[in-house]
């Protein structure tokens, strides 16, 4: 299933970014094998060239997967179209009215020294707007293993760290 996703990314990479994103949303939202995609999305494959369109699309798919996960637990959710300086996912409770903004992160396994700025804790707090919650979703093995500013920042800014 994950290989089908990578082939889909390769197929749509020549489209305009918004159109490619729409194609990938359809692929993820309408896929009955969603759990296979969910299990693999956290690490950018080394076969994807650094700073390429495919890498940007893979990162966008991680946001699409997060949005689908929110839908699976009963929230209304969408991937936001705005690029740069905003959260990537918005979700809202159907029953309780609370809302949240979120960002999903994917890193290469070969990238060992992640900078605290890569996690954008402060930015997520600023992008919260009128939403009650801000969430960063990242595979547990990609979070820093030792002391890191992201943990104190997430506490100070009330940003939830999901894995």
Kindly give the residue locations of the regions a language model identified.
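Active-site beta-strand-loop-beta-strand hairpin of nuclease catalytic cores
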Residues: 91-101
